[in-house]
Amino acid sequence: MKIDMNLLKRRIKVANKEVKADTVVKNGKILNVFTGDITRGDIAIVDGFIAGIGKYDGEQIIDAQDKVIVPGFIDGHMHIESTMLTPNELSKVLIQHGVTTVMADPHEIGNVAGIDGINFMLNASEKLPIDVFIMLPSCVPATSFENSGAKLDAEDLQPFYKHPRVLGLAEFMDFSSIVNLNEEMLQKIINAHLNGSIVDGHAPGLSKEELNVYISTGIYADHECANVKEAKERLELGMYLMIREGTAAKELKKLIKVVTPTNSRRCMLVTDDKLPDDLIVEGSVDHNVRLAIKEGLDPVTAIQMVTINAAEFFGLRSFGAIAPGYQADLLILDELQTVSIDKVLKKGICVVDNGEIKKEEFKINDNSKELAMKLPKINMKALEKNAFEIPLSSDLCNVIEIVPNSLITHHRVEKVDIDKGNFSASISNDQLKMAVIERHHATGNIGLGIVKGFGIKNGAIATTVAHDSHNIVVVGTSDEEMFLAVNHLKKMNGGIAIASGKEIIASLPLAIGGLISENSYLEVQEQLKILNQALSIIGVDADFNPFLTLSFLTLPVIPEIKLTDTGLFEFKRFSHIKVQA
């Protein structure tokens, strides 16, 4: 909270009714997230903060018309890069959905550009109509079993703790470094604690015994629970539970049953990774709240999970509630049950009215293009003709099987087709070739594997969004189409491309680090619409998002089997395995 003597005196005078408030919100039913009660009263706002609740007069009056007033929503864990939008463009989308604050982990751009990537995200998120707080990337690269664009050590991260919008260390995902007492990685945790900062987690598949080891370091939240058992264990051991509902990972329906009146204040709703078209149409954590209510959760509890619970976990003492001394981030809802948003006030200023952005409040210079000039371009070695060949002496192979709407994959051992000593894609068996091409240092590394579940009949999909090292990942029915899609990415300096036959039938440029578009959110939405339409041309008819699903098949810190630029990786062994079983 920024405060000085004059501001404090002015707030006291408004609270004491000696001077008028800047704005007073009248005639509303106020949700008290501390008690769960609905109360009435005028909300007096001065200098962006609430001075008091009671009977007040102000220079400006906002009539809530007997509607429900709740605190602005907080997304406690998300990645801006996954939205493919600059922070400025993203703010225009989120504010319409009542999201006034986000906790962003820039480990995507950090993996591509290191310190420059974090600086880009901090600078590009200044002075926006939402508050963007940063959790520092803890594991860049995610493991030593792949090649990222950068490496961030403890000493690289240390200076960032001085920044007022840096809150802590984000999703510590390298459990093996804790067990093996890796001092460099442990120093990152120590530095966060010494700076009085939060450390949040990423602990899929850990047993209760392993959780003891993990949590003993002072990691107190997790968003990677795959089932009710894991969720309960984390709550029992003192962790905050982040229930995730994004584009690829949809876990709310199965995990929301864990939330009870006695543990709900230790639970949050988050998005993690959500594509812009889903954000625009469906929403952010506002959608998660609606879904939780639909699944039977009390509306007050659901709203607490995206307001006061998140604020308290991250130590934001002036966020997440409607009370004196709190930032005036308010939503006026038509109904509590439907979370239908009429107005949004950010720091006391009405930025959304009747569900529409007030454009005069969004005259912000988006300097992302200029800031991105420091970020690296695609640097990949030219592909040789046989780059995607997978030699086999036996037809029994390790296969990655997609689990729809989950980041987890299944490890299958299956018989495959062989042609002239090499793996041959099988449309009938839905066994396709997949490759990960290193794109940061021109090493020439190419990891090759076999994947099933995409349902591509003729063509290839390639993208530079490939968690977490963000090399190029491509899947397809033929080497020629895979080559075409990959080379098109190089021309665009990153993005998504779909090839069919001898042509690129759809693409989305992501010129900022190969992750973020330079275009407006409406333009990106239209480009994604064209990409989605192109999926039918190559035969994809999936009930999951193929683009985000593909981008997570390269993340080795999530079970069961993934592919990096150095080869096929099995999570259980935490080591590479061969394609041939």
From Swiss-Prot:
Entry keyword annotation includes Hydrolase: yes
Family matches, as PANTHER family: ADENINE DEAMINASE, N-ACETYLGLUCOSAMINE-6-PHOSPHATE DEACETYLASE
Keywords for this protein: Hydrolase, Manganese
E.C. designation(s): 3.5.4.2
GO biological process: adenine catabolic process
Single GO molecular function: adenine deaminase activity
Organism: Clostridium botulinum (strain Alaska E43 / Type E3)
Top EC class of this enzyme: hydrolase
Highest taxon listed in the record's lineage: Bacteria
Catalytic activity, reaction form: adenine + H2O + H(+) = hypoxanthine + NH4(+)
Family: Belongs to the metallo-dependent hydrolases superfamily. Adenine deaminase family.
CDD domains the UniProt entry points to: AdeC
UniProt keyword Manganese, yes or no: yes
Name the UniProt record assigns to this protein: Adenine deaminase
Co-factor(s): Mn(2+)
Family annotation (Pfam families): Adenine_deam_C (PF13382), Amidohydro_1 (PF01979)
